[in-house]
Every structure is written in C-alpha cells, then in structure tokens.
Amino acid sequence: YLGNEIVNNHYGEKEIAIITSRGCAFDCAFCGGARSLNKDVTTRIRTEESVIMEMKEILSTYPDIQSIRILDDLFLRNGKSIDMANNIFSKFPQLSWRGMVHVLSLIGNIEKVKDLHNGRCRELFIGIESGSERMRKKINKLGSSDDVITVSKEILENGIDLKGYFIYGFPEETKEDFQKTYELASKIKEISLKTPGTFRTSVFQFRPYHGTQLYNEIVKSTGIIHGCEFNKSISQFEGRSQFNFEFGNYSAEIDEMLNEYIIKTQKLTEEEQ
C-alpha cells in the first residue's frame, strides 16, 4: 500500500491515492515505463478483494475521506476492469473516485462509460500527448485523434470530468504539429462547454528520459542531452512549479513558439466552463 497522505483535490474534497497495478502494457517512445524498457518486469494487477480490503482500511482510519485517486495506468484497461471498478466502488457509496485511462481501453467499450458515471467516477485522466498523427506515430501513441474525440465526447456527455495531458517539443515536431495538438485540445474544450462534464489541460514540454527510445535517438543523432533548467516562460501557472523545468528544445521550432503553444493550451483550462 502507499503511505496514506490526505490531500485536498481540486474539487475541495479530502482525497487519498492508491495503486492497484504496476507495469504498463503500452510502449510509448517517450515514457520510462514503456513495456520495451521493462521486459524483466511483468504487469502486476491486484485482485478486487485486495483493493476492497485497502479501501476498508482507509475508511476505518480516515472516515472523513471523500475521494480516492487511483494512480496506476492500468486500472481501466478493458471492459472487465471497468466492471471491476464499478463493483469495488458500489461497496463505498460515500466515495467518488478519479483515475487514468487509455483511449484504447474505452474506444472498444464505449457503452460502459455511462456505467463509470453511475459508479461515481468523478474525473478521468487521458494521456493525449499530440493531435498530430505524424507525431503520434513517431512516439508510438496508440489510437488516433478521432478516437480521442470519440472517447472524450462520451466521457463529457456522461457527466464525467476529463483531464487531458499534452506534450509539446518532441524531436522533429513542427509548428504544424503544434497547431494540430492545440486544435485537438480546443475541440475537446468546445465539446465540454455543451456537456455536463468539464475539461482541463495539463501541458508539458518534452523531456528525454534516460533509456527511452526518443532519448536514444537524440543521443545517436546529436550526442547531446541538455541539462535541467527552470523555464521562466511557463512559471506563471500557479501550482505547477514542479513541472516548469525543461531539458532543451528538441523540436524544429524556436523556444518562443514552443512556449507559446504550451501556454495557450494550458490556458484552455481557464476558459469559462
């Protein structure tokens, strides 16, 4: 179990985080948790009974807890796991919950999104990363931009809030790629304005994590990985100081343009809901 630290989430609810699985089935080129980097580690998934036991212990120790944040990537990995989530939280009607989901986990189980809402899922997080099909292919991000729209629309229409993660500054990324990502984020925002669910963004500059496919490509082509520096241009976002660091701009565009797209995509969160 994690150490149970209570935080106030952005809804103002008292929340505790748990982990129900380790390892990842996906192989994103930018991610240190990619399947190809962890061949000696099998995906480990806790049983439904184990998760229920931990939840009971949490509520016994902290009876005023209102929300559970599930940190792992694979909690909602297929239709069966969605059913399991609903069964777990049906036993704790006083709790709402939030968790990460991959687009492909829902695109094949789109009819189950309503079940998640009925099971008191408050918010889902999706790693969207890019709206450029060219860049999605380069970073091994499975699912298309159309899939992202389909899933996002279903989530929002069912009254579940959505947080989308975006990354700018991948190697060889151009202004055209930036624009496609911004347009995808904007389209989801427009959908949210007409639905019960709300949409917010969390935007990052690409970082070449050691050992990843993109890191190795950069080293091979340039021999240089830049050191960590504070990015003053994006430090304006309150509560994001731990994310306002960069390890160099590896895109095809200048820093000013890269920062411009990071900032305006992040600002979509501030627009009227």
List the predicted regions and their residue ranges.
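Radical SAM [4Fe-4S] cluster-binding motif and immediate context
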Residues: Y1-L162, F170, E183
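C-terminal accessory regions of radical SAM enzymes
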Residues: H10, E176-Q273
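Short, solvent-exposed coil/turn elements at secondary-structure transition points
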Residues: V103, Y168, R207-Y209
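A structural signal for short, well-ordered beta-strand segments
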Residues: L124, G164, T201-V203
